[in-house]
Curated annotation (Swiss-Prot):
It comes from the Eukaryota. PANTHER family: PROLACTIN, SOMATOTROPIN,PROLACTIN. Coiled coil: none annotated. This is Prolactin-2. InterPro entries: 4_helix_cytokine-like_core (IPR009079), Somatotropin/Prolactin (IPR001400), Somatotropin_CS (IPR018116). Its main location: secreted. Gene3D superfamilies: 1.20.1250.10. Belongs to the somatotropin/prolactin family. Disulfide bonds join 4-11, 58-174, 191-199. The keyword Hydrolase does not apply. It is found in: Secreted.
Length: 199
């Protein structure tokens, strides 16, 4: 259900409810991302040594994200909200292409395809929710347009199967990592803005 039908005047969804929905969504996205990565890893990455190559190769690396809760605590909530928005926007493009390209993987199970489609849709919903939250917390500010461009499509289409599978592996690895970060930042923001840091 849409949070507020467009054009509705008396739509009173509290900021707390908006955060509840965002946290539930981000948790679901992280759960799906982990499941999809594990399934892909089990099916395609065994014995290929991908994990040793997959260090720091995420397209969102240019967005400086706090490494742990302590670092995140130091960041002003407006900056943290904008950071979440930036990471989500950075995934629009890769998720769209992931849905298309995953269908071309040899014997790709339906479960992986379903998760890719579901994550792409839920990411859009979370992005809309975050824009609403930012509109409430910082009225008149839709957040900055900062996001990380993704240029990984050619690597998902490589003829060499090993290289192509590694590109998928890396993308799914990054998706799991970033969805985990977003999940943590949103929980922290909810605690700070809704519960006055008493959690």
């Amino acid at each position: 259900l849409p949070i507020c039908p467009s054009g509705s005047v008396n739509c009173q969804v509290s900021l707390g409810e908006l955060f509840d929905r965002a946290v539930k969504l981000s948790h679901y996205i992280h759960f799906l991302s982990s499941e999809m990565f594990n399934e892909f890893d089990e099916r395609y990455a065994q014995g290929r040594g991908f994990i040793t190559k997959a260090v720091n190769g995420c397209h969102t690396a240019s967005l400086t994200t706090p490494e742990d809760k302590e670092q995140a605590q130091q960041i002003h909530h407006e900056d943290l909200l904008n950071l979440v928005l930036g990471v989500l926007r950075s995934w629009n493009d890769p998720l769209l292409h992931l849905v298309t390209e995953v269908q071309r993987i040899k014997e790709a199970p339906d479960t992986i395809l379903w998760k890719a489609v579901e994550i792409e849709e839920q990411n859009k919903r979370l992005l809309e929710g975050m824009e609403k939250i930012i509109g409430r917390v910082q009225p008149g500010d839709t957040g900055n347009e900062v996001y990380s461009r993704w240029s990984g499509l050619p690597s998902l289409q490589l003829a060499d199967e090993d290289s192509r599978l590694f590109a998928f592996y890396n993308l799914l690895h990054c998706g799991r990592r970033d969805s985990h970060k977003i999940d943590n930042y949103l929980k922290l923001l909810k605690c700070r803005l809704i519960h006055d840091s008493n959690c």
